[in-house]
Amino acid sequence: MGNCYHPDAKFKDPVYELEGKHIHAMWHMLLERGKEFSLVYSEVEVFDNVASANWEASYKFNVTNLPVVNPVSSSFIFEDGLIINHHDSFDLYEWQKQALGFPGIMLGWTPFLKNKLRKYAANALNAFIAAHPEYQND
């Protein structure tokens, strides 16, 4: 997946805001840690250097082992045949309800838990990058 991105690419979703090699690292980490992962995509549209797609990822969240079905809308901008800008949209509260269970149901809508999740995800990605020199910035 990482090879689809331009070296100067930017990625944003409700959890991450990344650039360059860190996008590669995120996909590597998520796919490596995902249990029972499957992906279905639909409504792919391409016009010039812009594309969009809807997709649904199904997996067991590695921290809680709870099943997650996450519908995502993606938009892409391409440069030199590679993704230079990628934006994913999904309902973070719905994701937290599935992935975290009761705590996600009760607190997933709060800025407190959303920010805690973002911090946890950033720390996990930083640890992954530290263990994989190929993703460290030059």
Per-region residue spans from a language model:
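Short, surface-exposed beta-strand-loop junctions and turns on beta-sheet-rich folds
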Residues: 18, 59-61, 92
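Short, solvent-exposed coil/turn segments at beta-strand boundaries
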Residues: 1, 48-50, 76-83
